[in-house]
Amino acid sequence: MPIGELAIGAVLGVGAQAIYDRFRKARDISFVHRLCATILSIEPFLVQIDKRSKVEGSPLREVNERLTCFLELAYVFVEAYPKLRRRQVLRKYRYIKAIETIELALRSIIVVDFQVDQWDDIKEIKAKISEMDTKLAEVISACSKIRA
């Protein structure tokens, strides 16, 4: 994975984690106001991700599209808040269920980010093993020269 993809993965992870944290806190008091703040705070990340996803490969672009879809869905909730408040249907099951669905989807994005981090760790371990293998080969060749 190029460094750009890892950087974008980290940006996605930070953005998704911020959204996920805001969704968890939004249940307590006035979830729509906090959701609006989340959307506003994530928009700069989304712009950066859009710029980089045009350059990067398709798997990262798919994650970006999913995140964009979730943000658009959250924006719909923010726009619908005054109407919901007028009708006093804030506690209706279908809206709570929709927010829980978004939260579960954000968890899957966070898992993707962790997988990116794990991939980076695996690449580092492979590099270390390769270095150890070359050093071991040098030591063995040096020992065989000494015996001869």
From Swiss-Prot:
Any matching Pfam family: RPW8
Membrane-spanning ranges: 7-23
Cellular compartments per GO CC: membrane
Triggers of expression: Expressed in leaves after powdery mildew infection (e.g. Erysiphe cichoracearum UCSC1). Induced in seedlings by the beneficial symbiotic fungus Trichoderma atroviride.
Tree of life domain: Eukaryota
Locations listed in the record: Membrane
UniProt keyword terms in alphabetical order: Coiled coil, Hypersensitive response, Membrane, Plant defense, Transmembrane, Transmembrane helix
InterPro entries: Powdery_mildew-R_dom
Membrane topology: Single-pass membrane protein
Record flagged with keyword Manganese: no
Disulphide connectivity of cysteines: none
Coiled coil: 120-140
Any Gene Ontology biological process: response to symbiotic fungus
Role: Disease resistance (R) protein that induces localized, salicylic acid-dependent defenses. Confers resistance to powdery mildew (e.g. Erysiphe cichoracearum UCSC1).
Additional facts recorded: Ecotypes susceptible to Erysiphe cichoracearum, such as cv. Columbia, are lacking RPW8.1 and RPW8.2 but contain in place HR4.
The protein's name in its UniProt record: Protein RESISTANCE TO POWDERY MILDEW 8.1
Gene behind this protein: RPW8.1
